[in-house]
Amino acid sequence: MFKLIPDATFPATVLVPNGDAPLRLKVIFKRKSKEDLSEFTLRAVKLDDLSLCEETLAGWEEVDEGYSRDALEKLLKAYAGGALAIYSRYLESHARAERKN
């Protein structure tokens, strides 16, 4: 059944750059309304990587450490392209959802 009020979160898979073999990161994203997403994208250029990702992520699955601010910081330090991959997938997920609806 189609929900007029969507769930607050949704799952997605982010391909985190790792040389020739990107790593699949299963995440739970926070859903934003159209207005909130528009405002967020305007602010995003001023946010540091950690803040940017914290605002989009509600959690992750199948990672060797549970989701937390410290664990997210470790991920972003270990994988230089991680923040951009997360942000890009987040926007893509919203755009894809809008096209489907």
State what each model feature region is:
Residues 43-101:
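Acidic, low-complexity intrinsically disordered segments
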Residues 1-43:
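Short, charged/polar N-terminal "headpieces" of proteins
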